[in-house]
Amino acid sequence: MAILSDKWIREAAQTRGMIEPFEEAQRRDGCISYGLSSFGYDARVAPEFKIFTNVNSAVVDPKDFDGDSLVDRETEVCIIPPNSFALARTVEYFRIPEDVLVICLGKSTYARCGIIVNVTPLEPGWEGHVTLEFSNTTPLPAKIYANEGACQFLFLQGNERPEVTYADRAGKYMGQRGVTLPRL
């Protein structure tokens, strides 16, 4: 597998709609950076958040997820309580080529503040908004800034198309829009 450069990412975004909307240059004036980088793309977090709460004394069960465990917020600044968690999504909609796997890494600006971003790989043939998981590992409230950088995606090209892509198997998160909760 080879990591793909800014030139390849730009061409795929502009001619195949791989990333929409697409920021052709890295933006970083007075904000957490986002846009095209040398070997990746820094995506933005949309102003749509689901913050975990314990007001209903629910148990988090990935096989039977209860949406009542979350509070919906549309805001430019999301405050995650201490040692808590929030779901969000990217501003960008991704369409992953059939011979590419995408890995996501957190932004160092957030990591240095104890805020961890987790995203599973974007599989060949998948498309949708990416649901982002933010963990506040600190004993203090933490801010997430909407419409600014949240994570970096690295694009890896395989030596051939896999036998079965995410689209071929009709994966359960195919075409997701908005913040998407766990599905079984």
Curated annotation (Swiss-Prot):
Pfam families: DCD. Transmembrane segments: none annotated. It is an enzyme of class 3 (hydrolase). It comes from Erythrobacter litoralis (strain HTCC2594). Gene3D superfamilies: 2.70.40.10. Pathway: Pyrimidine metabolism; dUMP biosynthesis; dUMP from dCTP (dUTP route): step 1/2. InterPro entries: dCTP_deaminase, dUTPase-like_sf, dUTPase_trimeric. Homotrimer. One of its GO terms (molecular function) is dCTP deaminase activity. The active site is at E133 (proton donor/acceptor). This is dCTP deaminase. It catalyses: dCTP + H2O + H(+) = dUTP + NH4(+). The gene is dcd. HAMAP family: dCTP_deaminase.
